[in-house]
Amino acid sequence: RELETWLAVDLSASLDFGTAECDKRELAIAACAAVAHLTRGGGNRVGAVVSTGAQTLRIPARGGLPHARAMVRRVAELPRAAEGERGDLAAILETLRRPPRRRGLVVVISDFLGARSGEVFEWERPLRGLSARHDLIGIEVLDPRDLELPDMGTVVLADPETGRQKEVVTTPLLRREFAAAAAAHRDDVASALRRCGAAQLTLR
């Protein structure tokens, strides 16, 4: 009771990708709705910090069903990021660190495809800082094509956050290397979340 929950939501350009029934952005918004529903009531409050890279939306923590519904609607209506606009999950988390907030729950919703500084993800330090005052959950949002490439012959791969494109031939070797790199990245994300004291859920 009287739990304060904060959603840290990454809606950068890489989330505007999807090859399944919905894109990753839609999965992220569904995760927002689920957390808001599960944590409301009993004097609990929920708020959010959402960023596309170009625009940041801050929604104060409040209680009640009307607030939860309005919050999810505002997140869903946030304009999509422009191609070439980089996201910054670390900046979202820093926003939650300062000023210090009452002890509660922080739920981070992202595909965790952000940049690294050496072997460390740039979002690790601010997330570790949040762990001193909050319980943490990381919700990793994935598309099947984040994990493996289909056999499609010649395709153009694009990075939505830089705008860079590259034409490749999806040979068996390339597909194996892509799958191995994707699996290694997911293992690194899981290890980083554990180091920060965060539980992990995966949506795909």
What annotation goes with each model-predicted range?
Residues 1-33, 37-204:
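Exposed, interaction-prone extracellular/peripheral surfaces
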